[in-house]
A protein has these predicted regions:
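An active-site-proximal structural segment forming one wall of the substrate-binding cleft
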Residues: 87, 125-167, 200, 204-207
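Extracellular beta-strand ligand-recognition surfaces/modules
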Residues: 547-581
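Substrate-binding cleft of secreted/luminal carbohydrate-active enzymes
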Residues: 94, 98, 250-431
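Substrate-binding cleft/loops of secretory-pathway carbohydrate-active enzymes
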Residues: 167, 172-178, 189, 193, ...
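Glycan-recognition and processing domains
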Residues: 383-494, 582-584, 590-597
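N-terminal substrate-binding region of glycoside hydrolase catalytic domains
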Residues: 32-132, 295-299, 323-333, 345-346, ...
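Extracellular carbohydrate recognition and processing domains
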Residues: 528-560
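Short, surface-exposed beta-strand/strand-loop-strand elements in extracellular ectodomains
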Residues: 516-529
Length: 637
C-alpha cells in the first residue's frame, strides 16, 4: 500500500518548519551536561537521595501514550514532577520521549497503520507498533515533540538547568530498532540497515536538534544511540548517523553503550573503547559523553556468582571506556546498600567526572590482562590456530599458556556468545574472549611495559566464590625468578603540570600472601634517584590490604626509572601481588573510601535466571499467551 501526503499534513509540516525557523538560532552553543552530574543515576525517579547520597540524577521518560492520551490534549504532570524533584534535590535529570510502540492508540484510527510482530518476549509490553514512515505518524509525532519543547521552554531557568540532556528515541525504547521481532505483514518491514529507516532516523535527529539543541533558549544536549565512526577493517552500519551528528551537534553529544557497565570480558568491548575514548577522556576538539544502564543483567547466573565483584569490575570497565552516566535500577540500588556493594557506586562517582587531566583530582590503574583471541600479534595463528570468533580450540590454547597464573575458562560454551547472550546465559568466569579489553583498566594512570616488568594474575587466592573479595578477579605481581621485580607507572600528561613539589596522596591495594615478604613504593621527587614513600612487610594473612600515604614533595614529571612517576618495587626474592593504585591530588579525603571487609551474599537470586528459563519474563509472557489462546480455543469448541 502506498501512502500519500494529504494537503492537511503538508500544510502542517510547512507551518511547523516555519515556526521552528522563527525561534531557532544556528549559532554554536555550549550545551554539554555539567561534569558534576557525571556518576551513578537512578534509572527511574523513585530513590531518596538522602538514603542513597551517591545518586547524581534520575531519568524521566515522558512517553507519548501517557502525555497525549487524547489527540491534542497534553498531560505534562509526570515531567513537571520529575523536574521539580530534581530542582528541589539539586540533582540532574535527563528526559526521553518514547514513541514507537509507546505511541497513543488514537493514532491508529487516524491513518497510522498498526504493525504486529512475531516477538513473544515483548508481546505483552509492546502488542503493536506504528508504521514509522507513514506521513500521518510523522505529522502527529512531530506535533508531540514540538509541544514538548514548548512546555520545557515554559519552565523557569533554574528548572531548565536541571535537564542534563535529552535521549533521542526513534524506535523501540532506546535500542533504535523499529520493531521487536519481524512484522507479520512483511510490507511493514524496516530493518536497521533499510534506507527508509535510516532516513526516518536522520530526519528525527534533525527535528530534535532544531527543537532542543539549536534553540538558544534551551541549549539542551542530545544523546544518540547507534551512531558509529568508521573503524579500520570493521563494517559499521551507522557511519552516516555519526557524520550527521558531528557536523550538526558541533559542541558535542552523548552516546549510549549499555554493555560496558554490565560486566567485563564482553565480546566487542575493545572496539567500543578504542573508537570513542579519544572523544570522552582528554578530548581534543569534539567532546562526547557516554551513558549506559544496568538492566536485569545483575540477576543473571554470571553476575550472581559474586555480585559485589561483578559490579566492581563492570564499573572499572565502564570507567576505562570513558563512561559518564550509569543508570541503575531501583532494586539494584536498594540491594547495594543492604549487601554492602555501594562502594562501587561511590568509586564510579569519584572518577566519572575526571575528564581533563589538568583539572582532574584523581587517577587510577586497576591491574588486569584480558586474553583477546582476536589479537593475532599477541597470539600468532601459526601457533594458536586461526583467529575466528567460533574457534574455541584457539581460545583454550591461549588460556592454557597462562594457566599457571590462574587463567581459566569456566564456561566454554559461552566463549562463542555475543555480549547479549553472555550477560544472560554465561555461568562462569572466562579469561579469554573475542575483542575483549586486553590491558589494564585506567583513568589518567598507566603502567609502563606491563608484560616486560610484571606477570598477570587471575583468581587470586583460588577459585572465586560468592564471598571472594572484589579484588580477587585480576591482579599483577612480581616474578623474581624471571627478573620481573617492579611495576612502573606514569600519570597522563597534564595531571602534573610543572616541576614544583606537590601534595599527592597514593593508595595501593595488595594481597598479603607471604609472611615476611617486603616491597616498597618509590616516587619521582625531582631528584636523580626515586624516593621511597613507604616500605611494607607482609604478615601472610591471605587478605587484601590498602596502603595509603601522602607525599608533600611529589614532582611527577616522569623523572623516575623507565620514565615513571611511581614504582612498586620488590625488595626481596618473594613475589607480591597488587590489584589497584590510586593517585589523589592533595591530602587524603576523609573518610577513606573502602569496600566492606565482609562480602555479603545476596539471597533470593542464588544461581540467577537465564534467558528463557522458568522465572524469566519471556517465559511468563509466553505461558500467559498460550493460556489465553487455549481459553479462546475452548470457547470456540
Amino acid at each position: 500500500m502506498k501512502y500519500h501526503i494529504s494537503l492537511r499534513t503538508s500544510l502542517f509540516r510547512k507551518l511547523c518548519l516555519i515556526c521552528l525557523m522563527g525561534f531557532i538560532s544556528l549559532t554554536n552553543i555550549n550545551s554539554q551536561p555539567s561534569i558534576g552530574s557525571f556518576g551513578v543515576w537512578d534509572r527511574g525517579e523513585t530513590m531518596d537521595i538522602n538514603e542513597y547520597p551517591f545518586i547524581k540524577g534520575s531519568s524521566c521518560d515522558a512517553s507519548w501514550n501517557q502525555v497525549e492520551k487524547m489527540s491534542g490534549v497534553y498531560d505534562w504532570s509526570q515531567l513537571d514532577q520529575a523536574v521539580e524533584r530534581a530542582s528541589m534535590n539539586k540533582t540532574s535529570i535527563y528526559i526521553s520521549f518514547a514513541a514507537g510502540p509507546e505511541s497513543p492508540d488514537w493514532i491508529y484510527t487516524n491513518g497510522v497503520p498498526k504493525v504486529v510482530t512475531d516477538n513473544i518476549r515483548h508481546a505483552e509490553k509492546f502488542p503493536h507498533y506504528p508504521f514509522y514512515i507513514s506521513p500521518e505518524y510523522q505529522t502527529y509525532y512531530h506535533r508531540f515533540l514540538t509541544e514538548a519543547a514548548k512546555h520545557i521552554k515554559s519552565y523557569p531557568e533554574e528548572k531548565r538547568k536541571t535537564i542534563a540532556f535529552i535521549q533521542v528515541k526513534t524506535g523501540c525504547t532506546g535500542d533504535e530498532c523499529a520493531y521487536k521481532g519481524e512484522p507479520l505483514d512483511q510490507k511493514f518491514s524496516l530493518e536497521k540497515s533499510d534506507p527508509k529507516w535510516k532516513k526516518f532516523r536522520l530526519e528525527t535527529f534533525e527535528f530534535y536538534a532544531r527543537l532542543f539543541y539549536l534553540d538558544t533558549d534551551l541549549k539542551i544536549s542530545l544523546l544518540l544511540n547507534s551512531v558509529t565512526l568508521e573503524s579500520e577493517g570493521v563494517k559499521n552500519e551507522y557511519v552516516e548517523e555519526w557524520n550527521w551528528a558531528t557536523t550538526t551537534l558541533k559542541d558535542g553529544f552523548g552516546i549510549k553503550n549499555g554493555a560496558l557497565s554490565r560486566g567485563h570480558h564482553l565480546s566487542g568491548e575493545r572496539l567500543a573503547v578504542n573508537d570513542f575514548l579519544p572523544y570522552l577522556v582528554d578530548p581534543k576538539g569534539l567532546t562526547l559523553f557516554r551513558r549506559s544502564e544496568m538492566d536485569q543483567t545483575w540477576t543473571r547466573p554470571w553476575y550472581q556468582l559474586n555480585v559485589p565483584l561483578n559490579f566492581y569490575w563492570g564499573a572499572i570497565n565502564a570507567l576505562n571506556s570513558g563512561q559518564s552516566v550509569w543508570d541503575i535500577t531501583n532494586v539494584a540500588i536498594k540491594a547495594s546498600k543492604e549487601y554492602g556493594f555501594d562502594y562501587t557506586f561511590y568509586f564510579f562517582n569519584k572518577y566519572a567526572g575526571q575528564i581533563f587531566p589538568e583539572t582532574a583530582t584523581d587517577a587510577f590503574c586497576a591491574l588486569h590482562k584480558g586474553l583477546d583471541a582476536a589479537d593475532t600479534i599477541a597470539y600468532p595463528e601459526n601457533f594458536f590456530g586461526q583467529a575466528k570468533k567460533d574457534n574455541v580450540v584457539r581460545m583454550e590454547k591461549i588460556c592454557a599458556s597462562y594457566s599457571k597464573y590462574g587463567a581459566a575458562n569456566d564456561d566454554k560454551k559461552a566463549l562463542t556468545f555475543g555480549q547479549v547472550q553472555q550477560r544472560g546465559d554465561q555461568t562462569g568466569f572466562n579469561d579469554v574472549g573475542w575483542e575483549i579489553w586486553p590491558d589494564n583498566y585506567s583513568r589518567f594512570l598507566y603502567q609502563i611495559a606491563p608484560d616486560e616488568t610484571s606477570i598477570p594474575l587471575w583468581r587470586i587466592g583460588g577459585r572465586i566464590t560468592d564471598t571472594s573479595s572484589i579484588y580477587s578477579r585480576f591482579a599483577r605481581g612480581f616474578e623474581h625468578s624471571t627478573g620481573k621485580d617492579a611495576l612502573y607507572f606514569k600519570l597522563h600528561e597534564g595531571f602534573s603540570q610543572d616541576a614544583k613539589p606537590k601534595v599527592m596522596s597514593i593508595t595501593v591495594v595488595w594481597y598479603d600472601s607471604i609472611a615476611g615478604s617486603t616491597w616498597k613504593l618509590d616516587y619521582d621527587a625531582g631528584n636523580a634517584n626515586m624516593k621511597t614513600a613507604i616500605t611494607v612487610t607482609g604478615k601472610g594473612d591471605k587478605k587484601w590490604h590498602h596502603e595509603a600515604v601522602t607525599l608533600n614533595d611529589a614532582v611527577f614529571r616522569c623523572g623516575g626509572t623507565k620514565g615513571s612517576d611511581l614504582a612498586l618495587v620488590n625488595t626481596d626474592d618473594k613475589d607480591d601481588i597488587f590489584s589497584l593504585m590510586e593517585v589523589h591530588r592533595g591530602e587524603q579525603v576523609l573518610p577513606l573510601l573502602r569496600p566492606t571487609a565482609e562480602v555479603r551474599v545476596i539471597k533470593g537470586y542464588e544461581k540467577g535466571i537465564k534467558y528463557g528459563e522458568e522465572g524469566d519474563e519471556s517465559v511468563r509472557i509466553k505461558k500467559k499467551m498460550e493460556g489465553e489462546k487455549n481459553k479462546e480455543g475452548d470457547k470456540q469448541k
